[in-house]
Structure formats: structure tokens, C-alpha cells
Amino acid sequence: SSAASDVYKRQALVTGAARGIGKAVAMKFASEGANIAFTDLVLNDDMAAGLEATRKEIEALGVTCRAYAGNAADFEETQKTVKQIHEDFGSIDILVNNAGITKDGLMLRMSEAQWDAVLNVNLKSAFNFIHACSPIMLRQRGGSIINMASVVGVHGNAGQCNYAASKAGMIALAKSIAQELGPKGVRANAVAPGFIETAMTAQLPEEIRKDWMQKIPLRRGGQTEDIANVCLFLASDLSSYVSGQVIQIDGGMNM
């Protein structure tokens, strides 16, 4: 069967999906018929407008879509958000922990605030959503959890010790959850994007971009859809015997 029929009418929850990779994942799932709940942080009118614009774009694909403004790093708030999503959709079959930020800097110059912010938004938020969604998936005796990690979570990166540590944590979290929840039919995996063309990477200086391209055998940056396609595979029954794995999506940069 195709991946499309596998996720058709399933309920997916994607965090941090108003833009970038998260949005691409939500759109891909929706294009295959999955209903979408997504979250993102809303601090001002522009962010609120972005959230609603993405919701309409997803809904236009012919599925049910609801957007939930909130801080994924807040444990109590996440419990309430997931409870609301479960009431609104009736089930949560797929969870993609995508909410993430960077606050780069060399370790010796890094502030405690830079460290805490990245660990909270990237790693703690993943724990928060897994903690809230797991009982639902266990009662359903099935579900797929996907953590959005990074190649730097596998290999490290100078100037990104906070980000790399948070992404390595997301990988170990996925592996541990795969072991804990596997007996009840819940799978957990991580995807590790390499150099992906997003607003986040567009800000990099040209010489750094050139340097990256030389390290990539396919000689190009990835597209957000490249990540979404692998997430679709992991969300679907095509990957029903795949759990506790890290899939690097990096054009062959790391082997």
C-alpha cells in the first residue's frame, strides 16, 4: 500500500509548525489526508497572523486543521494543550516534536540564558509532548513519535554546543521511548537534517554556505520537503518495523 493510504484520516500533531520544516511536515501529512493539529509560539500580531495563515493553507488541502498558540517548553501548558487536541480530534496517532530554536555562540562566551533557552525549547518541549501524548497512544495501542534532531546532534558542532546537546538529547529520548513504549505498539524515531534551505540557514554568510556545499556529496542543500518525505515514511505503516532509529537527511555529508 502507499504511504498515502496509511496516514489517511489519521490525526497528526506537529509542534513549531507555523513555518519552516514543521510547516513542510504538516503540509505533507495533510496532502496525504491526515488531519493536523499544530502548535507554535505566538508573541505578537505577526506571529498570530502567521499561525492562522498556515492553518488556512493546510485546511485548503481538504483536511481538518487546528492551530494552538503556546509555549512548548511549558510542561503544564503542554498538558492542557494536548488534552484540548485530544478532545478536538478524538485521537493522536502521530507526534512530531519539531519546535526548536538556535542561540549560537562559542562555549566560553555562552551565557546561561543561551544554554537554558535552547535546552528548554528543543529538548524539554519534546519530553513535554511525549509525556502528554504517550497515555493516549498507549490506550490506542499504537502511534508514531518523530523527534526532529539534527546532524549536529550526532557529530557535534563548534559554536553550537547548546543546540548540539539538545539534539543529541532528542535522539537518546527517542531511543529510550522506543524501548519503553514498543511493547504497546508505539514507535519512536529521530530524523537528523543536515544543511536545509530555510529562513534559519538563509542568514548564514556566503563563505560558510560554500564551505558546507563542498562537504555534501550531492552538492546542494536539502529542501524542507526532503525532511517531510522521511517523516511521512516514519509516520506511516511503511515503517512499521522501524523504531529507535536516527535517519540522517544530509545529502551524504555524514556517513
Roles of regions detected by a PLM:
Residues 1-8:
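Short, small-residue-biased leader/transition segments that mark boundaries at the very start
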Residues 9-37, 177:
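Canonical Rossmann dinucleotide-binding motif of NAD(H)/NADP(H)-dependent dehydrogenases/reductases
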Residues 135, 179-183, 240:
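Alpha-helical segment proximal to the catalytic Tyr-Lys
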Residues 106-107, 114-119, 201, 212:
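Substrate-binding pocket helix/loop in short-chain dehydrogenase/reductase
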Residues 150:
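Residue(s) in the substrate-gating loop at a strand-loop-helix junction
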Residues 190, 213-238, 242, 249-251:
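C-terminal helical subdomain
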Residues 130, 166, 174:
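Active-site helix of classical SDR
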